[in-house]
Amino acid sequence: MSVVATATTVETGHAHPSVNRPNLTSVGTIIWLSSELMFFAALFAMYFTLRSVTGPDFWSEKADALNIPFSATNTTILVLSSLTCQLGVFAAERGDVKKLRMWFIVTFVMGAIFIGGQVFEYTELVKHEGISLSSDPYGSAFYLTTGFHGLHVTGGLIAFLLVLGRTYAARRFTHEQATAAIVVSYYWHFVDVVWIGLFATIYLIK
C-alpha cells in the first residue's frame, strides 16, 4: 500500500469523515517497522555468519532435512493472506465493516494456519531429524530466525483480533477503526515480506 498522502472515505451513518494518509499513527508505525527491519537484518547477519563459520557442506547437509514442498505451501498461504488483508483495508476505506470483518477473519485464519504449519515443522525436525535449538549452529540459526518471525506473525494475529473486536464493540464504524485497520495492514505486509526473504535464504539457498 502506498504511504503517499491520499484521501479515502469511510462512511459512518450520515457523516463522511476522511482517512488522510499518512497520519501520525501511520508514520509512527512505519518508523517502528524500520526498527524491526534492523532487528531482522541482524538475524540475517547472524545466520550468514554462522553459515560461513561452519562451512557450506555442513549447512547444505542440514538444510536437506527441510521439507521444502510443505514450507512452500505454508509460505503461499502467508503470502495470499497479505492479499486478503489488503482487501479488508479497501473495505475499511469504503466504510464496509462487514467486508472488513470477513477479509480480516480470513486473513487471521490463514495466519493461524501458517503458525500451525511452523509448529508442525518444528516438531518433525526435532523428532525425526534431531535438529533443535541447541543441537548445533544450524539449529540455533534456523529456530532463532524463523521463531522470532513466528512471534511477529502471532503479534499480527492478536492485532487482527483487536481490530475485529472494536468493530463488534462499537455502535458504528469510525475513522479511528479504519486507521487501525490500515496500520495493522502495514505490519502484516511487513512480516510477509520478511518471511519471503527468510524462506529464500533458509530453504532455497544452499
From Swiss-Prot:
It is a multi-pass membrane protein. One of its GO terms (molecular function) is cytochrome-c oxidase activity. It catalyses: 4 Fe(II)-[cytochrome c] + O2 + 8 H(+)(in) = 4 Fe(III)-[cytochrome c] + 2 H2O + 4 H(+)(out). The keyword Translocase applies. Its EC number is 7.1.1.9. It is found in: Cell membrane. CDD domains: Heme_Cu_Oxidase_III_like. Keywords: Cell membrane, Membrane, Translocase, Transmembrane, Transmembrane helix. One of its GO terms (cellular component) is plasma membrane. GO terms for biological process: aerobic electron transport chain; aerobic respiration. Its main location: membrane. It is an enzyme of class 7 (translocase). It comes from the Bacteria. Pfam families: COX3. The chain crosses the membrane at residues 30-50, 72-92, 102-122, 144-164, 182-202. PANTHER family: CYTOCHROME BO(3) UBIQUINOL OXIDASE SUBUNIT 3, CYTOCHROME C OXIDASE SUBUNIT III. Belongs to the cytochrome c oxidase subunit 3 family. This is Probable cytochrome c oxidase subunit 3. The gene is ctaE.
